[in-house]
Structure formats: structure tokens, C-alpha cells
Amino acid sequence: MFIGIVSLFPEMFRAITDYGVTGRAVKKGLLNIQSWSPRDFAHDRHRTVDDRPYGGGPGMLMMVQPLRDAIHAAKAAAGEGAKVIYLSPQGRKLDQAGVSELATNQKLILVCGRYEGVDERVIQAEIDEEWSIGDYVLSGGELPAMTLIDSVARFIPGVLGHEASAIEDSFADGLLDCPHYTRPEVLEGMEVPPVLLSGNHAEIRRWRLKQSLGRTWLRRPELLENLALTEEQARLLAEFKTEHAQQQHKHDGMA
């Protein structure tokens, strides 16, 4: 998969290219990340990349010419079929369904804004889609771009150590992930659930699904509103709610 980065701070992406799952993907040749800085396309001796906005107001905008030239260079390197994305608070909010959708593209170009943003005409002329990672303000598009890259890279065959990992991630089926445990079996009096030590894979699968449904109900109930639960899922969720109510009643009685 090819991912081009247009950013004033390409060095930030070493966190993606040199470390962790994405770093291994780059080393294995599964992920090709290249970057272009608008500063390298500035024509003046100060390498200016910002300009004043028409109409006044605080802050500056990214200068049109260096930014467009950097985008054009990224497009030329990517070749036909590259989707150009601008990381923007005005964009579609990234979720697991969106990640899965973006992962079907073999070529992405991510444009990272700075200052107060970019000229609207650049967005209209050069950008295919705008994406956001949440309703809050950041200093630039680099961190959202890294988030997008990390999440999309998990779908590339061979990137994860276990192919089931991406399938079982939180949100992969619209639910939060279930609790996980490793050694020791007892930690400060807290024991690993016996079912996970039983070796009964059918019961383990059932327990994990119940916990996943229950955790979603407790922490992100709005996610369940968009799901058509199977008969098994509905039954397990009902069991979880009953067990949770019993635990709460027991806890309240001890208080």
C-alpha cells in the first residue's frame, strides 16, 4: 500500500515508519510511506509557506502555491488511482467502518494542514475527501494522519502477527473488545475468569462475546442502537444485564 504525506513536518512520521506494527510493515515492504514538504516547493529565499487570509482575522493560512505543488508531486509519485485526503475538523469522523472503507484503496495521499487551515479552493481542486478524528482542535493534521495510517495499516495482509487480530479488534464487529488476561492467574487477589482456563473453546467464545456485548452496553450503548443483534447475541446481552444487576445489588448491600 502506498501512502503519500504532504506535511510541513515530515519528520513526525518517523513514529509511524520506524516503530511498532507500521514500522515492521514498512521494513517488510507492505507499506510504502513517502513525504513531501510544501517548504521544499517555496520560491523565495525564506521558504515561506504561510500567507495572510483575505478579510483579515487572526492567524495565517498555508500558502497556496507551495502546497499545491507538493500535492502535485505526491500525485505524480503515486500514479493513477490515488485518493487525496485532507485531515480536517470539518471532515467525516473516522470510525472503524471508515477505516475499513479507506483500507480498500491501494494509494492514499494525506494532506496535513497547519496554521488556520488551507485555501478553500485548494480543497475544491485537489482534495477527494475530508476526514476528522474527532471534535477537538489540534495544531495540525499530522497526528490525525498518523492515526489514520496506523488504523488502515492493520488491514493490510501480513501486517499483523495474527490475521484474526484485525477481525477481533474493538469496533471490528461494531462492539467494544472483551476483557483480556495473561499471567499470573491471581493478581492482588483478582483471579482470571475460570472459563478462560477451562480449555473449552466454545464456552470461551461465548464468554468473550457476552463480555463484548456487555462492555458495549455499559460504556457505548449508542453503538448497540445501530446493530441488528442475532438471537445468540440478544440472549447473551440479556444474561449480562441480569448478572450485572445482581452484582450491583450485592455491591450496594455491602456498602
UniProtKB/Swiss-Prot annotation:
Binding locations of S-adenosyl-L-methionine: G113, I133, G134, D135, Y136, V137, L138
Main location as per UniProt: cytoplasm
Membrane-spanning intervals of the chain: none
EC number(s) reported in the record: 2.1.1.228
Location of this chain's protein in the cell: Cytoplasm
Pfam family, one: tRNA_m1G_MT
Recorded superkingdom: Bacteria
Gene Ontology molecular function: tRNA (guanine(37)-N1)-methyltransferase activity
GO annotation terms (biological process): tRNA N1-guanine methylation
Keyword tRNA processing: yes
Gene3D superfamilies assigned: 3.40.1280.10, tRNA(m1g37)methyltransferase, domain 2
GO cellular component, one term: cytosol
Reactions catalysed: guanosine(37) in tRNA + S-adenosyl-L-methionine = N(1)-methylguanosine(37) in tRNA + S-adenosyl-L-homocysteine + H(+)
InterPro entries tied to this protein: Alpha/beta_knot_MTases, tRNA_m1G_MeTrfase_C_sf, tRNA_m1G_MeTrfase_TrmD, tRNA_m1G_MTases_N, tRNA_MeTrfase_TRMD/TRM10
Subunit text: Homodimer.
NCBIfam families given in the database record: PRK00026.1 (NF000648), trmD (TIGR00088)
HAMAP family with a match to the protein in the record: TrmD
Main function: Specifically methylates guanosine-37 in various tRNAs.
Family assignment from sequence similarity: Belongs to the RNA methyltransferase TrmD family.
Annotated protein name in UniProt: tRNA (guanine-N(1)-)-methyltransferase
